[in-house]
Amino acid sequence: MASFSERTAILVDGGFYRIQAKTLFGDKTPEERADELFSYCIRHLNKGSAEEASLYRIFYYDCPPSTKVVFNPIAKRQVNLAQSDQHRWMTAFFEALMKKRKVALRRGEELSSGGEYALRPGVLKDLCAGRRTVESLTD
């Protein structure tokens, strides 16, 4: 076994990883995504090394899913984010990560700003230029 000074910690930006993993590897269940993350970290740890590296811990940093109630201006109704599919998926994903050996979940805090709907820059530009109408917007 490697000595303490030879062990490696891996830090994962959870928000970035989730978006990139979904783009690169497609939709997965929370358990499959947790397995994928662990395997990905182990492959990265040993890539390009003649010696097998020793993992100290994987630190996964992410904010807990939002529980806010926000107004959807297109549907003209309140949306409880705590009851969303994304909230359920994130909660199950965090639970799956916590069951993994050598994985530590570090949760940040949700920003007090946010929690409102925002238009993508290209959509806003099209609205201002008259190439799109408010009625054409969808969720």
Language-model regions, residue ranges each:
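Domain-level signal for Mg2+-assisted phosphodiester chemistry and nucleotide/NA-binding surfaces
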Residues: 1-139
